[in-house]
Amino acid sequence: MSEYPRSPLMGQMMSQPLLISSIIKHADRYFGKNEIVSRRVEGDIHRYTYHDCHTRSRKLAKALAGLGVQMGDRVATMAWNGYRHLEAYYAVSGSGAVLHTLNPRLFPEQIAYITNHAEDQYLIFELTFLPLIEAVAQHCKTIKGYILMCDKDRMPAKSAIPNLMCYEDLIDSHADDYEWPLFDENSASSLCYTSGTTGNPKGALYSHRSTLLHSYASTMPDALNVSGRDSVLPVVPMFHVNAWGLPYSVPLTGAKMVFPGPSLDGKSLYDLFEAEKVTFSAGVPTVWLGLLNHVAQNNLSFSTFKRTVIGGSACPPAMMKTLRHKYGIEVVHAWGMTEMSPLGTCATLQAHHYDLPEEAQQAMLEKQGHVIFGVDMKIVDDTGAELPWDGKTYGNLLVKGPWVISEYYKGEGGDVLEDGWFPTGDVATIDGDGYMQITDRSKDVIKSGGEWIGTIDLENIAMSHPAVLQAACIGVMHPKWDERPLLVVVKRQGMEVSKEELLAFYEGKIAKWWTPDDVAFIDALPIGATGKVLKNRIRETFRDHVLPTA
């Protein structure tokens, strides 16, 4: 029953539910010969077509039905980006069950907590994760059986995992005569949990309708701009926010899909980019660091790679400039979150921006960007009053839209909405053209003498220094100012830079009082399950750090 008033005169259009199964049916019918290429855990390259994917997805759906999986049941996966994982995406959701992607980079205790909280019925996993599943299986109370994604001859002779089945046996033992059911498009389709950097992870439960609307919007020219002419390699994991929706939006267009499997090092990625003529990719900044280092160290170039979307955390401007100016790769800076399916904004230029000087255009592209249709946003102060869009005033960022959650799974956290808007936890500015720029996570903002200091700008400036590989900025207690910035730096291999040189590097680039009070050098920044820097770990490490100004 709709919550909105019903007109006395309704449109006379066909009523067809927006269901995930319609995407793979469309891909098979109209792009059936187009390729899906995967580097497998087994080590080889696997090739087949959208037609093959649809056929095997239906077989898997029939097998799951035979195991007693019903509409609304949760079926978990723990797998890399690959063809079998794609089949599970469509088989589970297409049958009316709920696909629950598990992040293997979480702590085992968190994985057990999530499977129990989701009440998963089955877990489909890849050979890489056999030891992990053997360790946690006894703590997963609701799982009835485990399905191992591997060739038949790779099945373990014995295992402590109860009711362990072979994925390929299930596929081979069922016919491809399964018919995708029709049901309400608002039915749950997928379940993704937050990374849980503080407290237990919380679940975001997507619907078929929200997923298809997100897929439509994300393929638009001023969003991800995916087309049938592309060869797409998603580096962002399928176990993290559904790989930003690419397993849906790419088949929707019929583009070639290339999956990297477990090999995400610079050389492996580069080799696959070149061999499969990849034109478009997507991933977090830390992944591109490894790829760019490999390319630079071996004096290589890209022959077909022309466009990438970078998100998950703010992309350093120095990286954007390297990709754009040195390698001719268009970088689309994007922003979103698990609670948003995840896409919210993309930084692409409007027509009048091309009249601006090059530096001004670059500044626009460094922002998180403009909303895609379907998403609305605003910034508010701590009282909830809306703040101006002047590009200077920063406030708490709120969003709403048809692919934004209304609550967490099972009501965790209570009523999360603020007057119908979802509070993102980000602090941002919005300029007169509607371009949003994250200045910080609200929990990461440094509060110094009653004023806010955003850490992202400080980190980006540091990473533009040639000797700095990575940087993170945190607030450290100060007897007079409450908090002051401490810059934590990882140097590039074989290069040196002093604290004094780095602090001097800020001169003229920011307000003087924003300049960090101290610099600490470490070997590596702690990285979390989704590729983001774990600032809570850094804060814990430097909790007792005494600033020279204290």
Across the structure, where does each feature detected by a protein language model lie?
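Conserved adenylate-forming
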Residues: L64-Q70, H174-S187, L191-L233, G245, ...
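Gly/Ser/Thr-rich phosphate-binding loop
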Residues: L252-A255, A275-G283, L292-A363, D376, ...
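Conserved AMP-binding/adenylate-forming core of the ANL superfamily
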Residues: I36-G82, L86-Y90, F107-A112, C166-D169
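AMP-binding/adenylate-forming catalytic domain of the ANL superfamily
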Residues: M149, A511-K532, T549-A550
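Structural core segment of the AMP-binding/adenylate-forming
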Residues: I23-I24, G66-L67, G94-D169, F183, ...
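Conserved AMP-binding/adenylation subdomain of ANL enzymes
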Residues: L212-S231, F239-T279, H294, T345
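AMP-binding/adenylate-forming catalytic core of the ANL superfamily
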Residues: L106, A112, L123-L127, S281, ...
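Conserved beta-loop-beta connector loops within the AMP-binding
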Residues: H370-L398, G432-D433, M495-K499, L534
